[in-house]
Amino acid sequence: MTSLELSALAPSEQHFLASKLLSDYVECIDDDRLEEWPDLFVDDCVYQVIARENADRGLPTSAMFCDSRGMLRDRIVALRHANIYAKHYYRHVLSNVNVKGVQDGELLVQSNYVVFQTLVEGDTQIFNAGKYIDRMVATPDGLRLKSKRVVFDTYRIPNLLVTPL
């Protein structure tokens, strides 16, 4: 699959491919297969988690920012071996996957998400909610994320943001 092929695909095919990549993305996180998570990005990717209030005002301050797949891998290594945090599990719910079009060989996609967090004590709460703004590109391995901007509506994060959203 090449970037030129993305614009040639029917909207239903674009939607299917985008939805599949998003499903793979949240499954890696929810099933704690975090070492596989960076493989869903291209090498020169951008991953940003930013509060809606900052995004709306054009402010650059992010809760998390990585500008390469190597940084994503480093984040997972730190999570597994250096960070100390309460054991928890995520469960994502995605909705309204909307392919906005193809621009410069990139599939522009927006979707909504809610993340439920369950702590080892068994309590489950809504941890975070917002939208994904994605730029996806075709690679020999299939569709991959060139850019993922996670814009969260949640006013505050109730505890440490360790695991990717």
Feature map (PLM): residue ranges:
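A beta-strand edge to alpha-helix "cap/lid" segment located at domain peripheries
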Residues: S3, V93, N98-L165
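Charge-dense, low-complexity intrinsically disordered segments
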Residues: A8, S12, F16, L59-C66, ...
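Short helix-to-loop capping/linker segments positioned immediately adjacent to catalytic or ligand/cofactor-binding
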Residues: Y25-E27, R80-K87, V120-D123
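A solvent-exposed, acidic/Ser-Thr-rich amphipathic alpha-helical stretch
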Residues: D43-N112
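A generic "alpha-helical surface" signal
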Residues: F16-K20, C28, A63, G70, ...
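Hydrophobic pocket/interface hotspot
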Residues: Y25, W37, L72, V109, ...
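Short, low-complexity N-terminal intrinsically disordered segments enriched in polar/charged residues
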Residues: M1-D31, D39-D43, I50
